[in-house]
UniProtKB/Swiss-Prot annotation:
Protein species of origin: Eremothecium gossypii (strain ATCC 10895 / CBS 109.51 / FGSC 9923 / NRRL Y-1056)
Amino acid composition bias (Low complexity), ranges on this chain: 216-228, 596-609
UniProtKB keywords: Cell membrane, DNA recombination, Meiosis, Membrane
Membrane topology: Peripheral membrane protein
Keyword Cell membrane: yes
Basic and acidic residues compositional bias, start-end: 345-356, 384-393
UniProt biased composition (Polar residues): 431-496
Function (record text): May be involved in the control of meiotic sister-chromatid recombination.
One GO term of the biological process aspect: DNA recombination
One Gene Ontology cellular component: plasma membrane
Annotated stretches, region: Disordered: 54-88, 216-290, 314-410, 431-504, 558-610
Subcellular location as annotated: Cell membrane
Designated name of the protein: Meiotic sister-chromatid recombination protein 3
């Protein structure tokens, strides 16, 4: 039930309105900064938004509100009209009234429709505006709309881009204030010249520019009309229809409207305008007719250039087939005979051979293998090729005749050959003088000799052959006759031979021959180089010492006095009956065995051949120490035995420093005993006489180095008669010290 107050008493008390009703209206607009009620009009709401909240909201003492007010600003302006009564029936403030929404006035939400615009400008340090920002805030039906627009100003240098779309042409129009030569007939168009100069750098725009953008074109009918107008304008001019090679495409017609969009490149017409002047043609001088001889000479030169290329005539003739080194070795004729039968162009050596003969490749390993064994000739043929290009004279054909050209060419080659021959002779004599000055000997006449050397001849042998000294092949039979002197026979002075250091090839050949025995060993002396008059060859067998050899099956006669037997260091078990029995004394054959051999790798360290002619016995500082001597006399597998009546080859690499006489015993299957021991020294002049005294037992320990039951004595030291030696056997069935013979020993013994 709604209570409607029909009247109001005028009593002293005042009716206080319910303020709680106003909260629902002021809460929505509190955020916008102004307080308005939904019942106010739109004009009152706009005015209320400009005032602070609470101003003019005081209580009035009259119903109309135009009475006295408690503030100065509470007066209501006249243009606002009379406000509605607060407590009347038609008041919109009262929610419980019947006419609160009667439709009078604007709706309640109309008070929030506002538009606010804010503009912000941004400037740089120079005061120039860079950006302009415009912000628009709209409140429509309680909804807030914010629009922000930012405008950027154009940077410097981009303003000329606005004029790219402007294609108007005003220079070609006839004006009263133009130049005089522009209006004259036949004068060039100034606009075309200016456009040529400005557009030369854009001639390759079609190649470098990116893909074309799609542009709107005029309809075909409009394009046809423009084409007709362009043709009419070209027909009015008096210029030729051609232009020079540097002309650029013409600009578009001035009748075309400027483009609406701003293009980023130059646009060319499909049918460019070409206007130019033909360059003057040069008149060629009339050719002079050539004679038949000149035509022939030109044809000959052209054919020669086509076949041989751009080379001079002397160099062309110098190209001859070169004789290989193998062909020179395989031929049986001498080089002088070949030089006589060979034309001078072919007989002249090549550049590589001349350098080899001059001494550019002395120590080259391949040059030793390729070196020719034939001696040098006195006349060295020079090379016809002239390596200095400045001195090469090119023969130009003479227009007189072909025969004169050929004669001049041959005369020129002969002169070159004679000059080159003189230069080569002078150089050859200077080389010979220098070589004789270095060697300190007089120059000897050199006689050519036929080479007998094979392919593997060393460098020193080849050089001795070139010097005129006969060199004997290592395959030839041995000859003890002295070699002829290599010195000159002018006077009594004999030049001394200079020793030469062996090269790598010499060492290689010597090592292969001496190590593996592919070929007989070369002749070497004790000093390691060839002597002048004496040549000692180690291929032959050295002489053996003068020692009488006895047949092993022969029994020594009883009347020969025997030397006394000296016992060894240890006591031996020898019975006197067996010592006195002369029938049991059987002399064993004597063999020659080396006590110690040293192998040397160099021929200079090898012992001289005179060491083979005498025996050097073993020498010991003390006669009591027989352990080392027994070890020296031990018969091992590597001992060298000289069989009786046979001679075995002694290697030159083995130097025999000591020779001792070792007994030879018959072969048995039992194990051999220890080696004998030597008790005294033997003189160098008399050969020692040795008798072996075997025994079955011996008290000398093996650690002391003494052999069991064997003692060797030697004769006097100064050539006196040898003392009698008696050899005693322990028993007839006792086995003597035996040595297992090798296959070669059995073979030599058989024959």
């Amino acid at each position: 039930m709604v209570h409607l107050p029909l009247s109001r008493s005028r009593s002293g008390r005042r009716a206080v309105p319910d303020l709680s009703r106003y909260q629902q209206f002021y809460e929505a607009d509190a955020a916008d900064g102004y307080s308005t009620g939904s019942g106010l009009s739109s004009a009152a709401a706009s005015v209320a938004s400009l005032r602070r909240p609470g101003v003019g909201m005081g209580r009035t003492q009259s119903l109309t509100g135009y009475g006295r007010t408690r503030s100065l600003g509470a007066a209501r302006p006249s243009y606002l009209g009379a406000p509605p009564r607060t407590y009347s029936m038609s008041s919109q403030r009262r929610a419980n009234s019947l006419r609160s929404n009667n439709g009078f006035g604007p709706p309640a939400v109309a008070a929030g429709n506002t538009i606010t615009v804010k503009t912000t400008e941004t400037k740089d340090l120079q005061g120039r505006t860079r950006t302009v920002t415009r912000q628009t805030v709209k409140h429509i039906n309680g909804v807030r709309y914010v629009e922000t627009t930012t405008t950027m100003t154009m940077p410097d240098g981009e303003y000329p881009d606005d004029f790219y779309g402007f294609e108007g042409d005003f220079t070609a129009k006839q004006t009263s204030s133009g130049h005089v030569y522009q209006n004259a007939r036949g004068a060039p168009d100034i606009s075309d010249i200016a456009e040529e100069e400005s557009l030369e750098e854009y001639l390759d725009a079609r190649d470098t520019a990116p893909a074309l953008r799609i542009q709107l074109r005029a309809p075909p009918r409009v394009q046809q009309q423009r084409q007709l107008q362009r043709q009419r304008r070209l027909s009015d001019t008096n210029f030729p229809a051609r232009r020079s090679a540097k002309s650029s495409p013409a600009r578009q017609s001035s009748e075309e409207p400027p483009a609406t969009t701003k293009p980023h490149r130059i646009r060319f017409d499909e049918t460019p305008q070409i206007v130019g002047i033909d360059p003057p043609t040069q008149k060629k001088a009339p050719k002079k007719q050539m004679t038949e001889q000149e035509m022939y000479m030109h044809a000959l030169d052209a054919a020669r250039k086509k076949v041989y290329g751009e080379i001079s005539q002397p160099a062309l003739e110098a190209k001859q087939p070169h004789r290989s080194t193998m062909s020179k070795r395989m031929t049986l004729r001498d080089e002088a005979t070949l030089a006589a039968n060979t034309p001078p162009e072919r007989s002249r050596p090549a550049k590589r051979e001349v350098r080899k003969k001059e001494g550019h490749s002395h120590h080259n390993f391949l040059s030793v293998l390729r070196r020719d064994s034939s001696p040098k000739r006195h006349a060295v043929q020079p090379s016809e090729r002239v390596h200095n290009k400045e001195k090469t004279l090119e023969m130009t054909p003479d227009s007189s005749s072909a025969s004169s050209y050929e004669e001049a060419r041959f005369e020129h080659s002969d002169e070159m050959y004679n000059k080159a021959l003189e230069v080569a002779k002078k150089k050859y004599h200077l080389t010979q003088e220098n070589s004789t000055r270095d060697n300190g000997t007089t120059e000897c006449p050199r006689t050519p000799m036929t080479s007998l050397m094979s392919t593997n001849v060393s460098s020193d042998t080849a050089e001795s052959t070139l010097l005129g000294t006969p060199v004997y092949s290592s395959n030839a039979p041995f000859d003890r006759s002295p070699q002829p002197s290599s010195g000159c026979e002018t006077g009594n002075t004999t030049p001394k031979s200079i020793p030469r250091r062996p090269s790598f090839l010499d060492k290689l050949v010597r090592f292969s021959q001496e190590k593996y025995g592919y070929r007989p060993r070369r002749s070497i002396s004790s000093q390691g180089h060839k002597a002048e008059h004496e040549h000692v060859f180690t291929d032959d067998i050295p002489p053996l010492p003068d020692i009488p050899l006895v047949d092993p099956m022969q029994v020594k006669p009883k009347d020969v006095p025997l030397p006394t037997v000296e016992p060894a260091l240890g006591p031996t078990d020898v019975s006197p009956a067996r010592v006195a029995d002369p029938e049991s004394n059987i002399e064993t054959p004597r063999t020659l065995a080396p006590a110690r051999s040293s192998i040397s790798s160099s021929p200079r360290r090898s012992s001289p051949p005179q060491a083979f002619q005498e025996l050097v016995p073993l020498q010991s500082t003390q006669s009591e120490t027989t352990g080392d001597l027994a070890d020296a006399l031990a018969l091992g597998d590597n001992s060298l035995d000289l069989l009786p009546g046979r001679v075995s080859e002694i290697s030159p690499k083995t130097s025999f420093e000591h020779f001792v006489l070792a007994p030879e015993v018959p072969e048995t299957d039992e194990k051999p005993a220890a080696a004998p021991a030597v008790a005294a020294e033997a003189p160098l002049s008399n050969p020692p006489s040795v008798v072996v005294v075997p025994s079955a037992t011996s008290s000398v320990p093996a650690a002391q180095g003494a052999a069991p039951g064997v003692a060797v004595t030697e004769g006097p030291s100064l050539g006196g008669p040898a003392a009698p030696v008696r050899a005693l056997h322990a028993t007839k069935t006792a086995a003597a010290p035996a040595k297992k013979r090798s296959f070669f020993h059995k073979l030599f013994k058989k024959y």
